[in-house]
Amino acid sequence: MAFQGTSRTLTQQSSAATSDDLQKILFSPEAIKKMATECDLGRHHWMRADNAISVRPLVPEVTHGRIASFFKSGYDVGELCSKGYMSVPQVLCAVTRTVSTDAEGSLRIYLADLGDKELSPIDGQCVSLHNHDLPALVSFQPTYDCPMETVGNRKRCFAVVIERHGYIGYTGTTASVCSNWQARFSSKNNNYTHIAAGKTLVLPFNRLAEQTKPSAVARLLKSQLNNIESSQYLLTNAKINQNAHVSESEELNVESPPAAIGSSSASRSEAFRPQVVNGL
């Protein structure tokens, strides 16, 4: 039988995500909690020896069922053109190590489709990271939209799969993975350009950078000079070379207020010169 749709029906087909009912399903307090607890959206997932393989769906089972029911009910009465698709433009994972760089181990991360029993990487998008490579950013881009259906007893959707290899002798957490994505749901689908999985190695954070600036060194030297109870020695505004390895025999050039020749203050200035402490 030919489809007997109205203009309102066609408007609804353009994007089911504009429906108030669907918004309530996606952003209810329960759905938000499930996204955190079941999917680890925006949370740190610890890779341990007793959790060597982690499969995290991008949609909680309860939310998946409600979304699928919403689209199916609209499809059955002719208001929607399909039973719904899940679209994920990109999945971004931030990976950090929690053990020494000497630990021999690696992580294998990829995006899979729960409709595939083998859980193979989608379009070969898979990234391997050795422990000494971390920290790193990893990204995946699915090339198709996933139908909101049930295959056997599995709710079909995309999932992040993380495998831990090696790390002999390390039973605790060896790496932390924080994944972020934004799932979209619509009655229409598409195919997308194949892009290889991205892997960007990140320089470790230098938390001592702020403490080794010349201003910090100058403050430390000033406090040391104040301890000798000599009010005539003033730190200069000259930049301090913090990269130089200064020995105890090297002297710090300081300026003092001008004094009259032959005065007692001038003689004390020449008799005492503070030294830079090695190891600043």
Curated annotation (Swiss-Prot):
<dbReference type="InterPro" id="IPR000603">
    <property type="entry name" value="MPV"/>
</dbReference>
<dbReference type="GO" id="GO:0044219">
    <property type="term" value="C:host cell plasmodesma"/>
</dbReference>
<dbReference type="GO" id="GO:0046740">
    <property type="term" value="P:transport of virus in host, cell to cell"/>
</dbReference>
<comment type="similarity">
    <text>Belongs to the cucumovirus movement protein family.</text>
</comment>
<dbReference type="Pfam" id="PF00803">
    <property type="entry name" value="3A"/>
</dbReference>
<feature type="region of interest" description="Disordered">
    <location>
        <begin position="248"/>
        <end position="267"/>
    </location>
</feature>
<keyword id="KW-1031">Host cell junction</keyword>
<protein>
    <recommendedName>
        <fullName>Movement protein</fullName>
    </recommendedName>
</protein>
<comment type="function">
    <text>Transports viral genome to neighboring plant cells directly through plasmosdesmata, without any budding. The movement protein allows efficient cell to cell propagation, by bypassing the host cell wall barrier. Acts by forming a tubular structure at the host plasmodesmata, enlarging it enough to allow free passage of virion capsids.</text>
</comment>
<keyword id="KW-0916">Viral movement protein</keyword>
<feature type="compositionally biased region" description="Low complexity">
    <location>
        <begin position="255"/>
        <end position="267"/>
    </location>
</feature>
<keyword id="KW-0813">Transport</keyword>
